[in-house]
Amino acid sequence: MIEQADEESVFRNRNLVEPDTIIDRDRIVGRDDQLRTVVSNLRKVLNENRPPNLLLYGPAGTGKSLIFDAVARQIRDISKNRGYEFGTLRINCQNLRSLDEAVYALVREAAHDLNEEIGVARHGVSTSTKYDRLYDLLDEGYDSVVFVLDEIDLLLGRRSSSSEPAYSDLIYQLSRASIESIDIQVSVAALTNDPEFMNNLDARAESSFNPRDIPFSDYDANQLQEILRNREDAFIQDALSEDVIPLTSAFAAQSHGDARKAIDLLRKAGDVANENGDLTVTENHVREAQEDVETDRSLKLVEGLTTQKKISLYATAAVAEFGKSGSTTASSRVAFPVYQFLTDVLDADGRTRETFNNYVREVGTYGQLDHERKSLGGKQGGGMYLMYEFKRDPGEIKKRLEQDERIADLSHHEDGLNRVIQAQKRNFAED
């Protein structure tokens, strides 16, 4: 049955409609100027010269990573054939909370690329020691390297009112590495959605970085159609009905010309067809996939919550998940002690019951849950409490929250969490 289902898939090569797949240059659409500029700058490596620092900026899904990665891969292959070791070390700064985490992430990437031990502890070691290990790896394994700092504007770090964002320090240190710390050639490519990014760098980082600017604009509907046409061979022959690509590109054009969303939607439409046992992807599959995307979008808002709000929501979702089978409700009288347990586990500051409830109610404005004020009447001395009801599977919300590295640690405490929840339920005789 499994083999039969695989044979009947609408996909020939599903990877081609994965948004982060590195594709060949001949599949790149509507980015001739940007492609020429990236090629012109990176090809300096082929003459064993250092490429300049680069700043690629523009809205999400406009081809920044796609173009840089496609060119860098080709340059690396050519260099390797010539006996010259060129590498790119990429980190996404979205979930990195500090300069120290960013430097460790670069060490980890270098060690993985070179098949070496990381060689430095993640915690309990100074950032300076991590830099030293990074530079040792670079000296041992490369002749030239480009640090690719994706979503660099999100690396703010733990700032006081007078301190600079962490990305200023990181860019300053990396852009000076080949001058002060190591013998190989080092460049920095910063990728950001923020066109004002350079205005936020401190003066020394701006002077040291001094990048070549490469702006990216939104794709229009015609370009999005061409992008999807160039990936049509991800599907078996005649698997796409005529209206699928125009409709998919139209939905994506409404989302500010984001090619990543267009590709993602086309893949999801194919998945819907597979799930339904259909051998042709139709307009209806696209519309169903778009509805799923819009539902998922509200969950993505959860990812942007502060840590305290995430812990509050996680505690409430856990109470609902560990309740009766199919339960989607959680009492604040149970959820708040669970929140206190979780803050202890994470060694995080605890907030008052009122603040906790304010956090959870705020999440309700994102379409995740509703709340209702209830009275205990004569039970347990009376009083009021809130009953939260989730609009979707609380387990799904927990999994989304666990994408945060810190919250992910809570998944290792499921048994203890369940015991606390059941004990609190017994205390308040609530289900």
UniProtKB/Swiss-Prot annotation:
Top-level taxon in the UniProt lineage: Archaea
Annotated positions binding ATP: 62-66, 219, 231
GO BP field: DNA replication
Signal peptide per UniProt: none
InterPro entries: AAA+_ATPase, AAA_16, Cdc6_C, Cdc6_lid, ORC1/CDC6, Orc1/Cdc6_arc, P-loop_NTPase, WH-like_DNA-bd_sf
Keyword set includes Lyase: no
GO MF annotation list: ATP binding; ATP hydrolysis activity
Cited SMART domains: AAA (SM00382)
Keywords: ATP-binding, DNA replication, Nucleotide-binding, Plasmid
NCBIfam families: orc1/cdc6 family replication initiation protein
Function according to Swiss-Prot or TrEMBL: Involved in regulation of DNA replication.
Family membership: Belongs to the CDC6/cdc18 family.
Record's protein name: ORC1-type DNA replication protein 14
Organism: Haloarcula marismortui (strain ATCC 43049 / DSM 3752 / JCM 8966 / VKM B-1809) (Halobacterium marismortui)
